[in-house]
Regions:
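Substrate/ligand-engaging "lid" and interaction regions
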Residues: 2-274
């Protein structure tokens, strides 16, 4: 098919529960994959294809549609976008699981702000439809049966931010005349996470990305100068395809957040924008 979209949160191998799962199955299966019940497969194709491949008649949530684009934009913006920025904010706040981040009195409000007050404002679909989708996403994030580790989401955070959050940041700035505070803080959180080290509770901070990005962040953080870190990251055209220092006010806002995270910690920095 020319264009498709799949939507399902798949945390991966259930290490914590694998012994109980094998006991229930009564055989060894080391290929077990944990996933949420929700699933969606959108296929851009004429209805003749649905007749030839009636997957939607097999109890599967499969949609055959004229255009996959609005489904793609909605999912990437309101599910993947929040995932990308909540994960470093949560981890640097001492939170390891997406569900716990959503239920946290401070980080939970941050997630809501990013979704409903910032990213949602950048989409052109009917507001009622977007609000329902966003609430459904939050319900999925709060799934009590899926322990979705935020560290698994943070793999390749810079390319993810570039595709999932940067378009929203630009559109928000264009429409509102100001930068979206949550998305800016999310970028600063990613930059801070790539500094590495350990959290206050002793947990390691281990970023994982393309070697060129890892080398750049190591070099920039070695200067100990958040202005140089900010300018260097935003100016890395091999990451962004452009120089983000040219976005009005962005460098100043990112540096301010970096300084606050270093001096006050993540939670206090988040509180300041709520």
């Amino acid at each position: 098919y020319k264009r498709q979209l799949v939507d399902r949160i798949v945390p991966g191998f259930p290490r914590k529960d694998i012994a109980a799962i094998k006991e229930k199955l009564q055989y060894d299966d080391n290929m077990v994959v944990q996933a949420e019940i929700f699933h969606l497969w959108v296929i851009e194709a004429p209805q003749e294809v649905a007749a030839e491949f009636p997957a939607d008649k097999a109890g599967l949530n499969v949609l055959f549609v004229p255009s996959e684009a609005p489904y793609h934009e909605r999912k990437v913006t309101l599910l993947n976008g929040p995932h990308t920025v909540l994960s470093p904010v949560a981890y640097l706040s001492g939170i390891n699981i997406v569900r716990d981040a959503c239920q946290h009195p401070v980080v939970g409000k941050f997630i809501h702000k990013v979704m409903f007050e910032e990213l949602m404002e950048t989409l052109n679909l009917p507001k009622a439809e977007l609000e329902k989708f966003a609430h459904d996403v939050l319900e999925r994030f709060n799934n009590p049966f899926v322990d979705h580790q935020v560290t698994s989401i943070m793999l390749n955070s810079f390319p993810k931010y570039q595709t999932r959050d940067l378009p929203g940041l630009k559109t928000y700035l264009e429409r509102k005349g100001k930068l979206p505070e949550g998305l800016v803080l999310g970028l600063a959180a990613i930059i801070t996470y790539y500094k590495g080290g350990v959290r206050a509770d002793g947990a390691e901070i281990v970023p994982n990305d393309a070697q060129e990005i890892m080398d750049l962040l190591k070099q920039l953080w070695a200067t100990g100068d958040t202005a140089k870190v900010t300018e260097g990251v935003l100016g890395a055209t091999f990451i962004w395809g452009e120089d983000l220092n040219l976005i009005p006010g962005l460098a100043e806002a990112v540096k301010k957040n970096l300084d606050s995270i270093q001096e006050k910690g993540m939670l206090e920095t988040v509180k300041a924008i709520l």
